[in-house]
Amino acid sequence: MRGNSVDLQEIVLVQQGEVPENAAVHSGEHSDDEGESEEEEREQVQQVPTPRRTLYLVESQCPFCQAIIRFVCVASNTGIRNLQALLVNSHLDLACHACVEQNGVQGLRHRQWQ
């Protein structure tokens, strides 16, 4: 680096698990400046936190027969909160399988729901 700021040409990004071009090709080869162990190198690589995803059992009520509808989804904390807001605060309902089987989609369009 020359000066006080980093030049774009001086930044080299390597995805985790990739071998840089100047790395030793054979496992027996070692470069002279290879003083750090793999563990020290891993500590230096800053890990990007990924959102933790969890299984959730979601329950809703069919607007036609009031049966409880259950499904499982995998979501982050933000994702499950968005789904909750969508199901609770908006005009969105899920129809149960039995109502769809019994009436069909066209039949449900003509029924009143609560």
From Swiss-Prot:
GO biological process, one term: symbiont-mediated suppression of host type I interferon-mediated signaling pathway
Motif, Nuclear export signal: chain positions: 80-88
Zn finger intervals (unnamed): 62-99
Keyword Transcription: yes
Matches recorded under InterPro entries: Papilloma_E7 (IPR000148)
Region (Disordered), start-end ranges: 17-49
E7 terminal domain, as annotated region: 1-43
Keywords: Activator, DNA-binding, Early protein, G1/S host cell cycle checkpoint dysregulation by virus, Host cytoplasm, Host nucleus, Host-virus interaction, Inhibition of host innate immune response by virus, Inhibition of host interferon signaling pathway by virus, Interferon antiviral system evasion, Metal-binding, Modulation of host cell cycle by virus, Oncogene, Transcription, Transcription regulation, Viral immunoevasion, Zinc, Zinc-finger
Molecular function GO labels: DNA binding; DNA-binding transcription factor activity; protein domain specific binding; zinc ion binding
DNA-binding among keywords: yes
Subcellular location: Host cytoplasm; Host nucleus
Disulfide pairings: none
Pfam families found in the cross-reference section: E7
Record's compositionally biased regions (Acidic residues): 31-42
Coiled-coil positions: none
Superkingdom of origin: Viruses
Self-association and partners: Homodimer. Homooligomer. Interacts with host RB1; this interaction induces dissociation of RB1-E2F1 complex thereby disrupting RB1 activity. Interacts with host EP300; this interaction represses EP300 transcriptional activity. Interacts with protein E2; this interaction inhibits E7 oncogenic activity. Interacts with host TMEM173/STING; this interaction impairs the ability of TMEM173/STING to sense cytosolic DNA and promote the production of type I interferon (IFN-alpha and IFN-beta).
Family membership noted in the UniProt record: Belongs to the papillomaviridae E7 protein family.
Domain notes: The E7 terminal domain is an intrinsically disordered domain, whose flexibility and conformational transitions confer target adaptability to the oncoprotein. It allows adaptation to a variety of protein targets and exposes the PEST degradation sequence that regulates its turnover in the cell.
Purpose: Plays a role in viral genome replication by driving entry of quiescent cells into the cell cycle. Stimulation of progression from G1 to S phase allows the virus to efficiently use the cellular DNA replicating machinery to achieve viral genome replication. E7 protein has both transforming and trans-activating activities. Induces the disassembly of the E2F1 transcription factor from RB1, with subsequent transcriptional activation of E2F1-regulated S-phase genes. Interferes with host histone deacetylation mediated by HDAC1 and HDAC2, leading to transcription activation.
Protein name: Protein E7
